[in-house]
Amino acid sequence: MKNTRLFMFAACTLFLAACGRQTVKIMTPPDASNRVLFGAEQLQTTLDKAGYQVMMQQGDTTFSDPEIKTILLTEVNDTTLKKEGFHISMTGNLTRVSGRDGSGVIYGCRELIDRVNDSDGKLNFPEELKDGPEMVLRGACVGLQKMTYLPGHGVYEYPYTPESFPWFYDKEQWIKYLDMLVANRMNSLYLWNGHPFASLVKLEDYPFALEVDEE
């Protein structure tokens, strides 16, 4: 009986705490792309951590409850926006995040996420904001190389095996790294790998660079 009372008390406490949390609804169209849904998921995670009660709604995007803070994520064919650009606008409790494409929606969501994180969890969203990347390709370079020769090798060449590069096969780490790239508005990843052969190009001015016998 005592355990039952404790359980009921804990359940009531959690219920009352949840009731005291501000509700935020995130709406996406029924045909939302994977990128739009990814942006919604990242926004939901941030709002959850900030203490909000988040409602996810995919399908009907009608703004029907003006008392609830609502965020609508959509892709729009707006030629005034750059590729991967976005437009944030507010009307009352409705915040629209419109992206020129799926990536634009993600970057619009990241803008809201940054503002939540920078304001101690407050929903200080811009009333009007248009933005987009200046450069087409933005990315990071990861080196698949080592600082020393492998035993028995006289050049920088390596087999890409779990033994030689265990981190390269760490899926969980890669997911975190890719999420970091998204947070920094990057859209490409470059792997700088050593060539599997010592050299393949013969240069007349640099004959000593040819370490593989022509025969």
Where are these regions (language model features)?
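Prokaryotic Sec-type signal peptides and long signal-anchor helices
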Residues: A11-T13, E67, V212
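Short non-domain terminal segments
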Residues: R5-F7, T13, T61, E84, ...
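Generic alpha-helical secondary structure signal
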Residues: A11-T13, M56, Q173, L181
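Feature activates predominantly on carbohydrate-active enzymes
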Residues: Q42, T46, T79-G85, M90-E215
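Acidic, contiguous N-terminal accessory segments
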Residues: C19-G92, K122-P126
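Bacterial Sec-dependent N-terminal signal peptides
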Residues: M1-T23
